[in-house]
């Protein structure tokens, strides 16, 4: 059976200095499912979304503006989002939400930054 397993979120480096770069790495095992989307949140606010390609279209990435969160789109993809010039506002709960398509399964992994 296709299922989504083992979603984890890592913050690299574990202690992010203000003004530095941070990488949020969302790891997951799709088994036989198809990826639909990966969304990243700070608290309840989404700041980055990756949507897998459908019907031959290119994968889509979208950034949602949140003060203090600067996404480096050129280095962000289905498994990581890179933040530059990190502000104090990264502190707290960040999460990644992985959704599969056919069968539809959604799982969330949380981390502290």
Show the residue positions of the predicted features.
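Ligand-binding face of N-terminal immunoglobulin V-set domains in extracellular IgSF glycoproteins
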Residues: 25-27, 67-113
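N-terminal V-set
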Residues: 31-67
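N-terminal Sec-dependent signal peptide, specifically the hydrophobic helical h-region
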Residues: 1-14, 67
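Short secondary-structure capping/turn segments at boundaries of alpha-helices and beta-strands
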Residues: 10-12, 23-29
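Short, solvent-exposed loop/linker segments at the N-terminal edge
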Residues: 14-20
């Amino acid at each position: 059976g296709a299922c989504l397993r083992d979603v984890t979120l890592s913050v690299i480096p574990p202690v992010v200095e203000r003004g530095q770069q941070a990488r949020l790495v969302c790891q997951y095992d799709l088994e036989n499912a198809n990826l639909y989307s990966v969304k990243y949140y700070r608290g309840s606010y989404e700041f980055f979304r990756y949507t897998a390609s459908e019907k031959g279209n290119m994968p889509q990435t979208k950034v949602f503006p949140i003060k203090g969160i600067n996404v480096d789109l050129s280095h962000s993809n289905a498994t990581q989002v890179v933040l530059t010039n990190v502000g104090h506002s990264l502190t707290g709960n960040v999460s990644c939400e992985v959704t599969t398509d056919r069968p539809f399964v959604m799982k969330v992994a949380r981390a502290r930054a």
